[in-house]
């Protein structure tokens, strides 16, 4: 009996896939089909997969072509599978020609002609075509444009900014460049807002009432009441309102949270997060987006692991700011301490003070160490009393997390299902703390 094996993601199964499976089956007597796992797709940068692993496996099974279906979960598995299943022929699409020649040491390799004019990528693009506009003056606004090129079905068509003269070249070359938000809203289906946090509520509300989906740099309001009202409005009108905190969508950070919540380090007693930069010179302070202070730029990012691991029901907090008196929103250094019934947390953020940008999560059995810059990590460690027990975890990170954030947003819009990695109670808590930072008379100030 001649055994044949082939692999694929098989997202949005189409006649091109079916033709390839039929040709592979004709090469032998028994066909094994390997369907890629979601984590494996993410690890190799394939982030636009629409369907779940279970759906994709079921679609392949329903064709009746495969004799056996397995899951591809890791790099190098093809060699293991060929040996384990006694494979005679490895078959794959011709667009991979030459890529798998090394497998000829283990079995015959056959490259099959692809069906022209059809692909999962084109189907995803047709289904999810979303015209998106950018709003704001942030120095990193162009990162959204650059990373959107890797997201099927998303097209950045314009930008609304008060500083057209200082736009990055890529933004300045967009079809629509304006200082009129209404002009931008008329041309798009959704907006990404990256502006001064003091402007977020008005801009988000404006966009939602214009019927647009919104991805907004956190927080999207400065009080829980305003934040909850925006989330309720979006839900009632079938619109997506999503926090833009890139770290939440990175694979390494997400897996870290799952391990900690699963008790890998015992009970969490302390979370300490630090985010700082000195990249802004005094001259840069004149540029809008560079003068929001450490809290405006880093606050929600540093608070994210605290709220996701310890919750939002802290019993007390202290906010300390170092910055020009009377301009708390331009504070160059901020430290916030939170006390919970059974834990504590601390965060430091700064645009004028430098410190090690690490994340440390202390537990009763072990601790998690994430080296700088932890907010865009692809690696972390779980460290125990006995160093021999330490574990290291590595995960691919594409586009600093922006890319994963954008694909999650597109999927939420296209499916109508909320799938943000940031829960509503955390969004509300971020609004609360950021509002206290800007407005609370109890903020302590140091020189």
Regions of interest found by a model, annotated:
Residues 297, 303-376, 407-417:
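Contiguous beta-strand/loop segments that form the cofactor/metal-binding neighborhood of enzyme cores
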Residues 247-319, 326:
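Predominantly a Rossmann-like dinucleotide-binding segment in NAD(P)-dependent oxidoreductases
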Residues 128-172, 401:
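N-terminal Rossmann-like dinucleotide-binding module
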Residues 134, 183, 190-193, 228, ...:
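C-terminal helix-rich "cap/oligomerization" subdomain common to oxidoreductases
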Residues 1-129:
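Nucleotidyltransferase catalytic core that binds NTPs
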Residues 176-233:
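Beta-loop-alpha module in the N-terminal Rossmann-like domain of NAD(P)-dependent dehydrogenases
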Residues 33, 111, 216, 241-243, ...:
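Hydrophobic residues in well-ordered beta-strands that form the structural core
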Residues 229-246, 267-271:
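Rossmann-fold dehydrogenase core element
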């Amino acid at each position: 009996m001649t055994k044949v094996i082939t692999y694929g993601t098989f997202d949005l199964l189409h006649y091109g896939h079916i033709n390839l499976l039929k040709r592979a089956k004709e090469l032998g007597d028994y066909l094994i089909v390997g369907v890629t796992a979601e984590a494996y797709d993410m690890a190799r940068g394939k982030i636009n997969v629409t369907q779940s692993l279970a759906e994709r496996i079921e679609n392949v099974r329903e064709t009746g072509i495969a004799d056996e279906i397995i899951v591809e979960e890791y790099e190098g598995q093809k060699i293991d599978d060929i040996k384990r299943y006694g494979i005679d022929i490895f078959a794959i699409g011709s667009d991979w020609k030459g890529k798998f020649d090394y497998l000829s040491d283990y079995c015959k390799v056959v490259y099959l002609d692809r069906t022209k004019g059809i692909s999962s990528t084109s189907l995803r693009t047709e289904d999810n075509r979303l015209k998106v506009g950018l709003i704001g003056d942030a120095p990193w606004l162009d990162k959204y444009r650059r990373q959107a090129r890797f997201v099927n079905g998303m097209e950045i068509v314009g930008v609304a900014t008060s500083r057209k003269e200082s736009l990055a070249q890529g933004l300045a070359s967009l079809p629509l460049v304006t200082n009129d938000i209404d002009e931008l809203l008329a041309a798009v289906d959704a907006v990404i807002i990256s502006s001064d946090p003091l402007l977020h509520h008005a801009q988000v509300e404006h966009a939602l009432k214009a019927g647009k989906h919104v991805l907004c740099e956190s927080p999207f309001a400065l009080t829980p009441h305003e934040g909850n009202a925006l989330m309720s409005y979006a839900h009632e009108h079938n619109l997506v309102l999503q926090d833009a905190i890139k770290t939440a969508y990175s694979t390494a950070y997400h897996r870290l949270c799952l391990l900690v919540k699963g008790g890998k380090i015992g009970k969490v007693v302390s979370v300490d997060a630090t985010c700082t930069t000195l990249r802004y010179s005094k001259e840069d302070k004149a540029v809008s987006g560079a003068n929001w202070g450490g809290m405006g730029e880093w606050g929600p990012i540093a608070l994210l692991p605290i709220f996701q691991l310890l919750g939002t029901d802290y019993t007390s907090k202290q906010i300390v700011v170092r910055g020009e008196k009377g301009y708390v929103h331009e504070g160059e250094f901020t430290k916030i301490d939170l006390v919970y019934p059974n834990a504590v947390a601390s965060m430091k953020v700064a645009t004028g003070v430098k410190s090690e940008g690490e994340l440390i999560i202390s537990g009763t059995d072990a601790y998690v160490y994430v080296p700088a810059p932890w907010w865009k990590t692809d690696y972390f460690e779980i460290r125990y009393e006995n160093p021999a027990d330490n574990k290291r975890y590595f995960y691919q990170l594409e586009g600093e997390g922006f890319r994963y954030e954008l694909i999650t947003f597109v999927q939420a819009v296209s499916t109508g299902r909320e799938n943000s990695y940031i829960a509503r109670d955390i969004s509300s808590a971020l609004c609360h703390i950021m509002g206290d930072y800007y407005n609370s008379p109890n903020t302590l100030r140091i020189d």
